[in-house]
Swiss-Prot record:
This is UPF0473 protein lwe1514. Belongs to the UPF0473 family. It comes from Listeria welshimeri serovar 6b (strain ATCC 35897 / DSM 20650 / CCUG 15529 / CIP 8149 / NCTC 11857 / SLCC 5334 / V8). It comes from the Bacteria. PANTHER family: UPF0473 PROTEIN CBO2561/CLC_2432, UPF0473 PROTEIN CBO2561_CLC_2432.
Length: 100
């Protein structure tokens, strides 16, 4: 099921996702990237407002952005191969963050 997401350039790292009950929830974007192997764009994000010492669940979706770059559709990750690639990229990202 595709979910709508909005992007406000004043809050560049926040997306708003409408859940199944129709309620909007804020998520912070960890990072996004394009995959040539799967010809898709992906975004990794987590619930906004979590403190640094709380354990967070990082979510991943592929997405299709609208022409203006302000709104789009999140799509579920479809294959194990995509998940493997996302997990590898996330591990590299987290390792790089630890080094800084």
């Amino acid at each position: 099921m595709a979910e709508e997401h909005n992007h406000n350039h004043e809050e560049e790292n926040i997306i708003w996702i409408t859940n199944e009950e129709g309620k909007e929830e804020a998520f912070e974007i960890l990072f996004d990237f394009d995959s040539e192997d799967f010809d898709k764009s992906y975004v990794l994000y987590f619930p906004a407002g979590k403190s640094e010492d709380e354990e967070i669940e990082i979510l991943a979706s592929s997405y299709i952005q609208d022409e203006e770059g302000k709104q789009g559709q999140l799509k579920p990750v479809e294959t194990d191969e995509e998940w493997d690639m996302i997990e590898e990229i996330l591990a590299t990202f987290l390792a790089d963050e630890d080094e800084e």
